[in-house]
Design a protein with these regions (language model features):
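N-terminal alpha-helical transmembrane segments of multi-pass membrane transport
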Residues: 1-65
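Hydrophobic transmembrane alpha-helices of secondary-active transporters
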Residues: 25, 48, 77-101, 235-238, ...
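Alpha-helical membrane segments and immediately flanking helix-loop junctions
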Residues: 75-80, 91-94, 109-119, 123, ...
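Entry/N-cap segments of selected transmembrane alpha helices
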Residues: 97-121, 272-299, 350-354
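Juxtamembrane and boundary regions of transmembrane helices in multi-pass small-molecule transporters
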Residues: 122-131, 163-191, 298-311, 356-373
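Alpha-helical transmembrane segments
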Residues: 159-176, 285-294, 318
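Membrane-embedded hairpin module used as a gating/binding unit in multi-pass transport
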Residues: 169-243
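Transmembrane helical segments that form the transport core of multi-pass membrane transport proteins
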Residues: 214-299
Length: 373
């Protein structure tokens, strides 16, 4: 009875708020199906770490440090960057770069749509965040959860909780974020532009050489990005080599599912009331939304600028698919195109831009690590 009273008496309002946050994440995962693989374990973990005297996280008791399970997992999987890198292998194994390789102009949108990262980074500096904290906040605009986790774990581990929540929540609601921005920046006639798609065969040799070439180029431009881009491209090489089919399927399914579960559960170790319930958390979440909006706008505007020099016009909506939220963003563009003109089929173009965004986001993260690390 004394133990129960001690626990109840140790509750703080911040811990109660975080328990509500945890319950909210679980609700979003189950009821709305927003990134359930990550938000469900993150939400449950948040409840665990905010129980007073919880053995889930490391605690000082009578002058002795008692290590908690989630804290140990955090040190092994996040602090060492192991979990995000394993996720990159899984993501690489899932991606088919054929739509991009058959239409290389889409590379431009994969890079242009990363502008929100650097613009938001500047905004964070204006709000008084340090350079490393600003970079960690800006990388939310990568629309790539593992990249956001990797960079923030390196630069600002104390902000990992709100950055992860913002990144994955906004990725899940891309269908709500992008359409208003796209409509604001385009005319109806622009949204109805049709793009012919002539499927060009991409040889097996090209598919095998592509991940190797990207890794070499990234390594020369930004050596600090090699672990990020290298693990992503290794996963893709496993997919495309044709002799590791069982490993490819295992990476896409078992590896992705298990590591995502551990990643979400482990991130919760940073989501204690003392760390999370601060004014800076609201600022980070708000700036994350700004980053997604700026990414979308940059992609659309890049397409409009490119159209000034092309006789065969690009539908500006395709530029918005250059963010890394794959395949949600490509689906958004396809749906918007069909709403404007049911005969308009933009999916393959949007997928090309979307997978280019996967490369662009990882390279952007690598550049931040290279020049700020």
């Amino acid at each position: 009875m004394e133990q129960i009273l001690a626990v109840l008496g140790a509750f703080t309002y911040k811990q109660l708020i975080m328990m509500l946050v945890g319950a909210g994440l679980i609700w979003l995962a189950i009821e709305k199906e927003y990134e359930p693989n990550l938000l469900l374990p993150m939400g449950f973990g948040t409840i665990l770490v905010n129980i007073p005297l919880s053995s889930a996280i490391s605690q000082m008791v009578d002058g002795t440090l008692h290590k908690g399970a989630l804290s140990v997992l955090f040190d092994l999987g996040i602090a060492t960057e192991l979990f995000p890198l394993l996720i990159f292998i899984a993501v690489g194994a899932m991606i088919d770069f054929s739509p991009l390789l058959s239409n290389p102009v889409m590379f431009l949108f994969g890079f242009a749509a990363q502008a929100g990262i650097f613009l938001t980074m500047g905004l964070a500096l204006l709000f008084g965040f340090s350079l490393h904290e600003a970079a960690s906040i800006g990388i939310i605009g990568a629309a790539d959860g593992p990249t956001s986790i990797y960079v923030s774990a390196r630069f600002a581990p104390h902000l990992l909780g709100p950055i992860s929540v913002a990144a994955y929540t906004y990725m899940a609601i891309v269908p709500l974020i992008q359409p208003p921005v796209i409509r604001l920046l385009t005319t109806k006639s622009e949204r109805r532009i049709k793009m012919a798609y002539a499927k060009r065969a991409v040889s097996r040799r090209t598919k095998i050489l592509f991940p190797i070439a990207v890794t070499l180029v990234a390594g020369v431009v930004a050596p600090a990005s090699v672990s990020l881009i290298g693990f992503l491209m290794f996963g893709n090489l496993v997919r495309e080599c044709g002799v590791l089919e069982r490993l490819s399927k295992a990476a896409q399914n078992e590896l992705a599912n298990l590591v995502t579960l551990l990643l979400g559960f482990t991130i919760a170790a940073t989501m204690t009331g003392e760390r999370f319930v601060q004014t800076s958390t609201l600022l980070i979440i708000a700036m994350g939304l700004v980053a997604f909006i700026l990414d979308t706008a940059a992609g659309v505007l890049a397409a409009k600028v490119l159209n000034l020099f092309r006789s065969e016009k690009i539908n500006p909506m395709v530029g918005a698919a250059g963010i890394s939220a794959f395949p949600m963003s490509a689906r958004v563009i396809q749906r918007m195109g069909q709403q404007e003109d049911p005969s308009n089929f933009l999916l393959m173009h949007a997928v090309g831009a979307n997978v280019a965004g996967q490369i662009g986001s990882v390279l952007a993260g690598g550049l931040l690590l290279a020049y700020l690390g």
